[in-house]
C-alpha cells in the first residue's frame, strides 16, 4: 500500500464554529482524518502537525520550516506523496514558495477549505480526499507543488 504524509498547518479546514464566526486552526490531523472515512483505505498515513495557525499569520520563515519538513519526506523512500492542509488566505503564496524551494520528483499537494469543519456542508473532508488522490497518482510525479 502506498504511504501518504499529511502535514497540517491550521487554517479554515481545521477551524471550528459557525460559518460566519469561527476560529481557525482548532483541529489536528487525526480530527481531519476522522471526517474522511475512506482515506485510510487509500494509503498508509503519516500525520505531522507542523503549525496550528491562521494562514494570514504565516511568514516566509514558516515556509522555510515547512519546506525542510517536506524535503525530509521527499527523501524518504517509503513516502509516495505529501498533502498539506492550509488556510485559504495565503495558500497560493505558500504553494509558490514551496514550488521554488523543493525538488519535484514526489507529489506535494496543498488543500484548504472555505467553510470550517463544523459548518453546515463543510468542504474540507472532500477537498482532503481529493488532494490525497492527486498526491498518490503516478500522473502527479514530477509536476511540482
Indicate where each model-derived feature is located.
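Active-site histidine-anchored catalytic micro-motif
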Residues: 1-145
Amino acid at each position: 500500500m502506498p504511504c501518504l504524509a499529511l502535514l497540517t498547518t491550521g487554517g479554515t479546514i481545521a477551524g471550528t464554529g459557525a460559518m460566519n464566526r469561527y476560529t481557525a486552526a482548532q483541529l489536528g490531523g487525526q480530527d481531519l482524518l476522522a471526517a474522511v472515512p475512506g482515506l485510510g483505505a487509500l494509503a498508509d498515513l503519516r500525520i505531522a502537525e507542523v503549525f496550528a495557525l491562521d494562514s494570514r499569520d504565516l511568514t516566509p520563515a514558516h515556509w522555510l520550516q515547512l519546506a525542510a519538513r517536506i524535503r525530509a519526506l521527499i527523501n524518504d523512500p517509503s513516502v509516495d506523496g505529501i498533502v498539506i492542509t492550509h488556510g485559504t488566505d495565503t495558500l497560493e503564496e505558500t504553494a509558490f514558495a514551496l514550488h521554488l524551494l523543493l525538488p519535484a520528483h514526489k507529489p506535494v499537494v496543498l488543500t484548504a477549505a472555505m467553510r470550517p469543519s463544523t459548518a453546515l456542508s463543510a468542504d474540507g473532508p472532500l477537498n482532503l480526499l481529493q488532494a490525497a488522490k492527486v498526491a498518490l497518482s503516478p500522473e502527479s510525479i514530477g509536476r511540482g507543488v
